[in-house]
Amino acid sequence: MINQPASSTPIVSALAFLAVAIGTAVPTSAQQSGTQANEDREIETVIVTASRRADPAAALPTAWSAVDQSDLQRIAPQHSNQVFNRVAGSWVSRGNGQESLISLRSPVLTGAGSCGAFMTAQDGISLRSPGFCNVNQLFDANLLQAGKVEVLKGPATVVFGSNALHGIINVLTPAVAQTRNQVRVEAGSRDYYRLSASGSFDSIALSAQTTRYGGYQDESGYKQQKATLRLDHEWQSWRVAGALEGSNLDQETAGYIRGFESYQDDDAREENPNPEAYRDAWSARGHLDFSRDWRGTGEISLKPYWRSNSMTFLQHYLPWKATETNQHRSIGLQAMINGRSDRLGWRAGMDVDHTEGSLFETQAEFFSPNQPDGVHYDYEVDADSLAAFTHVDWSITERWQFDAGIRIEETRYDYQNLTGDGPACAPSASACRFYRPASQKDSFNDWTGNLALSHHTANRTVFAKAARGFRAPQTTELYRLQSGQTIADIDSETVDSLELGIRGVAGGLTYDVAAYWMAKEDVIFQDRDRYNVSGAETEHRGLELTLGWIINDVWSLTGNGSYARHRYDSDIELLGSRGTIEGNDIDTSPRHFGSIQLMADFASRGQPLSAELEWLWVAKYWLDPNNQHEYAGHELLNLRAAWDLSPSLTLTLVATNLLDEGYAERADFGFGSYRYFVGEPRSAVLGLTLAL
């Protein structure tokens, strides 16, 4: 019998409310998550992530969510999870400082290559090279000053390949015309300070911010800087849109606190068991998108790009506390051509990426013969990927549309070991933890595709979709081996997905409902011998709901909820498990979570005041594959308010955890004990924005 955590949060009433609202709605057109319900309904929402060009969001035969610029400005995110709380099916688990782990139609995935399950991108280009992802890579994106954040859920479209397994997060830089001329100063609890500014001139816009935070736990905190330069220009018959973005993070990291429900102890919450921990990360990337009309109804686009990333951090979560430095540099090109006849649209493209990366791990102090001091790993990898894709959409009738697409992709790795082959330990070690495989070359050939059928009326879209996604192994899964594993004989992970969805608008109500089933095969995992192997199977089923309701000219309500089951679908000898785990919930996969925002805007009543009360919840979840240890879940209340002191000056307040709940942002069970990244107590940030 499968053990299941009992329901602990009063979410049932919230889901019931949303369900009743949907049940009483007359079907209509598409919704946008966040507060799009407050926007002018005459302005049609578009999504660019699905095809690399603007598509009417209402008609897309795939599940999506978007958080627009006005939402981002009101949220004023200090961390990425404050944005993705508003996306149905998404939970970004907050670590310490700016660290995070992503859940998108999935559990919160951990491990060397877990980040490969998600595509995180800026303007459609992966923040990091697909074979060199990092679980914390969202901290590279300039979310505060983005023009929009778009999320596609599940294996979505063929313009994305490796890593677009569970979904795509695409952060769009604001167009020059969209960039606000303003300066913003913020100050808050525990020495939080942020200065941000943005402005545009002619065809160029610049946005920049700098943040300093003193930290809640002892000897923690961070300094971070981000900047985005945007170009929009026309040259002869070409339209040119480009961006240059960089970020720098200097973080003093607080480690897990230990002990069952220690996050409820006020003294324990402030402790930092790892005052020596740190993370320094630097990133920069740029692209130019050249596009021009082709044969009247078509378009040609060429988008060359480059990226550079470097990060050094202490592995405080491991007892021997090694230090890792990883970096990579890339150049690439996205090329696409599209056209349209009366009933048939098509596009075809090619993507090329070349990356040179490296990883160096060393340990300062001797821990044991099996975890010695000195160099553990030192290697370089040259990676090349080449992909071609095509997609067609056929308007069968005025209301029925059929979509189909396919993508083939090859990934090649040329690995060079720069230190001694074999174990990093002395010959007398009984079970050396670190093994350096000999230099080698690997290649992977994969494909992805989708079929969709959709029905459209003036105010409703219904769709059914089948899709396949994949991810090639990450370089760390192949070349950072342990416990005597001489070679990682692993293959690409694949996922097959079926999805049904309906979205619409009825008067003041918007809604979006999607149900999905996904089966993953050849899942890469670490077995009980600490070998990286393929062959696991997992199943993912869920229901997602997003709602927006304009109650009257002042009050509005938005909300999202997700109910899902993520389980092991094969009997594997997973590290940390005992006996059989087939049928168990995958650890760190709450059955339900979501958020509701109640908003008031008194501008129509002649009062320059707006406010938002937010309730968010995460249900309890298991911490281990045997489903023996669990976290109880939590609920939080947050408040945001803005007061226009004058036409050019606005005072803002962001207050989080209003009830001062003791909770964990992330819970874990490892090395024989409960471990928690502690949630912060009640906090407040005051801001002053000057429009120029």
Segment roles from a protein language model:
Residues 257, 261-264, 356-370, 412-433, ...:
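Surface-exposed extracellular loop regions of Gram-negative outer-membrane beta-barrel proteins
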Residues 340, 395-402, 410, 510-520, ...:
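Gram-negative outer-membrane beta-barrel transporters
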Residues 125-153, 172, 489:
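Short acidic/polar hinge/loop motifs at secondary-structure boundaries
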Residues 187-212, 217-254, 276-299, 340, ...:
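Transmembrane beta-barrel wall of Gram-negative outer-membrane proteins
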Residues 196-197, 202, 299-315, 454-469, ...:
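Membrane-embedded beta-barrel scaffold of Gram-negative outer-membrane proteins
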